[in-house]
């Protein structure tokens, strides 16, 4: 059943048809249904990889689970590295981010040492939906609701997420049908962590209120956001190419035809400020636009820079 399902997934077919099968990769293996599914997927496709398991020691059973994973990988003919996190790394006030930084640094180190060409992560559709909803509630820009990307780079090494379109229930049911045992990590339900609260409370509540699954609409929103971001970059590029630099002053012409397009004007200004190492808030961008639209000169401070707005031009000193 496992191989039959995976062979019928066209997005996976596209992914693996473009993967360089001559190279070797790293698989982040937690032992949960997601990463075990990915292990068997990579194995069934003939991908050469090394599994890396990070034991944070957060659960009493974690050491035994790490040993069981080693035995499973040995039985499957998959090389595995098990890393037990030192106690001093477990006391951070922000355990989620501290753990993430630790494992990414470890993955990077292993890739360099073993000459591996990418890191496989088993994030799935539900993880993606959680990311998008979190960004919506945090007030992210429309172009930044795109969630996790299928391929990004960390310190020059590709991060590969081929399961982003597959719901978690599909992964777990497929393993259940094949009688493949996996770990149920209780930290995934520990509501001290935001992700667990979203997973256990917010999503079920929203779906109960709406009477429908909200994962797919959030994935659609992420796709729309990705497309919007690409489109806006294309539209903004002709204007950004006209940035001028005189000594330490950057200037950008904002023609009337651009000012008539509010969204694009603010996007161009945002990218202009970003090129100078400045992240501008929505309020600041709106203020700049209001002065441009009304033809009113202004001088404002943004971080350690001075922003000057004149008729049809924005300058950064």
Swiss-Prot record:
EC number, as in UniProt: 6.3.4.19
Highest taxon listed in the record's lineage: Bacteria
Q: Which GO terms describe its cellular component?
A: cytoplasm
Gene responsible for this protein: tilS
- Keyword set for this entry? ATP-binding, Cytoplasm, Ligase, Nucleotide-binding, tRNA processing
Decide whether keyword Ligase is in the record.
Answer: yes
Q: Which InterPro entries match?
A: Rossmann-like_a/b/a_fold (IPR014729), TilS/TtcA_N (IPR011063), tRNA_Ile_lys_synt (IPR012094), tRNA_Ile_lys_synt_N (IPR012795)
Q: What is its main location?
A: cytoplasm
Q: Which CDD domains match?
A: TilS_N
Q: Relate the protein's function as given in its record.
A: Ligates lysine onto the cytidine present at position 34 of the AUA codon-specific tRNA(Ile) that contains the anticodon CAU, in an ATP-dependent manner. Cytidine is converted to lysidine, thus changing the amino acid specificity of the tRNA from methionine to isoleucine.
- Which PANTHER family does the record cross-reference, listed alphabetically? TRNA(ILE)-LYSIDINE SYNTHASE-RELATED (PTHR43033:SF1)
| Full protein name | tRNA(Ile)-lysidine synthase
Any notes on this protein's domains? The N-terminal region contains the highly conserved SGGXDS motif, predicted to be a P-loop motif involved in ATP binding.
Q: Which reaction does it catalyse?
A: cytidine(34) in tRNA(Ile2) + L-lysine + ATP = lysidine(34) in tRNA(Ile2) + AMP + diphosphate + H(+)
Q: What GO biological process term is on the record, naming one?
A: tRNA modification
The record lists the membrane-crossing segments as: none
Localization, UniProt: Cytoplasm
Family indicated by similarity: Belongs to the tRNA(Ile)-lysidine synthase family.
| Residues where ATP binds | 30-35
What does the record give under GO molecular function? ATP binding; tRNA(Ile)-lysidine synthase activity
